[in-house]
Amino acid sequence: MAQECKVPLVHIEAGLRSYNDEMPEEHNRIESDHIAKWLFTPTQQATENLKREGFKGRVIEQVGDVMLDALQMFQSSAVYTEKMGPISFFHKPFALATMHRFENISSPERLAFLVDQLNTFNDTVMPVWMPLHPATAVRLKEFGLNLTVHVAPPVGYLEMLWALKQAALVLTDSGGLQKEAYYSDKPSVTLRGETEWVELIQMGASVLYDPSENQPLAPIALNMLSSFKPGTKAPYGDGKASQKIIHALGLA
């Protein structure tokens, strides 16, 4: 739309690559990089991706992750609400789970496998709390699948931050929640075969879990729990990405 209206485009989170051509977000990222005038990258790897792909005549600036800015700004405002379920549930160790990626919910077989793994983890390792994405809820009903974990309706950002603060572990296919778990010093299992946030895997802050390999989830998650060591926030900037973008655009 910006290109059609001849409005200069700024791409925040430029240069990220998962190298999964079947993921719609991957196509959107690459297309946005090609039409944007300003490319603001969150990481050194993202910057190198753009340079390797031959982007020229654009402003490329590494600023860090705007999601770190947001978390630092709003973490103190995190809040529990009754729709999340009984507050007593959150007083014991639990795993926070989310799932919404097209590749995970579009296939009946793949979704059934993930549901089985989450149910088993809930029954044998620790309770799982899962705010259910509307698209996932539709697919579960369509495929006749039953989640026996502790399901909640969709929650807002401040509620999610509160739950994240209480959680012992995160199980997610969300790129954003992977990082928020890391920023909150929580280990995570990424329910995908790849991630654009490769630094999390390299640092041992998260581990990939590819459902197509049909491996049990529990051993991988338990190993992540035992091996995780909270790290620094350096790979994703200093929490001032938004300020750097404003200054670069001459809006300060």
Task: Name each model-derived stretch.
Residues 1-126, 135-252:
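Nucleotide-activated sugar donor-binding and catalytic core shared by glycosyltransferases
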